[in-house]
Design a protein with these regions (language model features):
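ATP-dependent adenylation/nucleotidyltransferase module used to activate substrates
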Residues: 1-196
Length: 196
């Protein structure tokens, strides 16, 4: 295959093109960003949250978005990353801090960490299909605790940004749909939920 050959998508209507996705993101941020003095980005270091962080920083650096009074990036340190990835995450937080972004590292308390459950309590290891106890415990709960602190300190005027990508697999899409539809939450580009 030569470089000029373009592979057509098997699902042409299932995805937004880059320019469409960027325009929708920019429109959403212009609509909701100015209403919030604090923006919080939940960052795991994975593809989705890193894409979100990169896009928001790009839009701000290009002057396409007005910056908030405060921007906070909360990194979920699971203590399970490979050392080079953990080092890179901390290096990026340091760079963000140098640019005026508040970088915070959140992690589960010792008694809720992966190996304490696996080795200390004998809980079976998680799998991707049916038994995913660790994601909530070592990522979601610590992030939620920190975000509640931020919201309380900001008087509730916080825009929470999370990277969610659908279309990776049917199992993942089902998980996203299930988690986003409980408690009145909404997920996906262009959706906004105002907490009271």
């Amino acid at each position: 295959m030569n470089k000029k050959t373009r592979i057509r998508s098997l699902f042409p209507d299932a995805r937004l093109r880059y320019d469409e996705a960027m325009a929708l993101t920019l429109d959403s941020m212009r609509a909701w960003g100015p209403n919030h003095s604090v923006w919080v980005i939940a960052w795991s270091g994975g593809k989705d949250s890193t894409t979100l962080l990169t896009v928001i920083l790009h839009l701000l650096s290009e002057g396409l978005l007005d910056p908030p009074e405060r921007m906070i990036v909360c990194y979920a340190d699971t203590r399970m990353e490979l050392p080079p990835l953990a080092h890179t995450a901390q290096s990026l937080l340091k760079r963000l801090r140098a640019e005026g972004v508040e970088g915070r590292t959140v992690m589960a308390p010792m008694d809720k960490r992966y190996f304490v459950y696996l080795l200390g309590r004998g809980v079976p290891p998680p799998n991707n299909n049916t038994f995913r106890w660790c994601t909530r415990q070592i990522k979601v709960d610590p992030m939620e605790t920190e975000i509640k602190r931020v919201v309380a300190g900001a008087g509730g005027n916080v825009l929470m940004l999370t990277g969610v990508r659908q279309g990776e697999s049917a199992i993942r899409d089902g998980r996203i749909t299930m988690s986003c539809s409980k408690d009145g939450d909404e997920c996906g580009q262009g959706w906004y939920q105002q907490m009271t």
